[in-house]
Amino acid sequence: GSEMCIRDRGMVTWAKENAVASGLKDAPIRWLVDDCVKFVEREIRRGNHYDAIIMDPPSYGRGPKGEIWKIEEAIHPLVKLCTQLLSDDPLFFLINSYTTGLQPAVLAYLLGTEMKRFHGKVMAEEIGLPVSSNGLVLPCGASGRWESL
């Protein structure tokens, strides 16, 4: 079995509904609404570890005290911090970004640098929406994944 922790306010309500609809009402899921960096720092202090991380950070945001989050400035420190949460033998680390200025190569470099000690492989690609009228793809962001060998 596995356990899951979801900490995004907008996703918690939606995910709870999906868990109930999927027969997972009593599954070991931690529902949290919290600042991500503060959550990660607390988990590190508690000695908790995770086998996988799925991250979908916002492009821009403001905290309750006016703190500003800009993905271009904050993503590297956040990923570096999150690597301290990983178990000794992690399965994967996934980052989705719907910021068109954050290219797949940046996510690949970031994951390759911060996950190097785990000896896995890195993949990154553009996220896009197909345009039916012309067969082209409208770029919407990037996805990067590190996975164990």
Where are these regions (language model features)?
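Short, small-residue-biased leader/transition segments that mark boundaries at the very start
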Residues: 1-6
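Mobile active-site "lid"/loop adjacent to the S-adenosyl-L-methionine
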Residues: 11, 33, 50-81
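Active-site proximal loops enriched in glycine and acidic residues that flank catalytic Cys/His/Asp
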Residues: 15, 33-35, 54-57, 64, ...
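Helix-to-beta-strand junctions that scaffold the AdoMet/dcAdoMet cofactor pocket
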Residues: 86-88
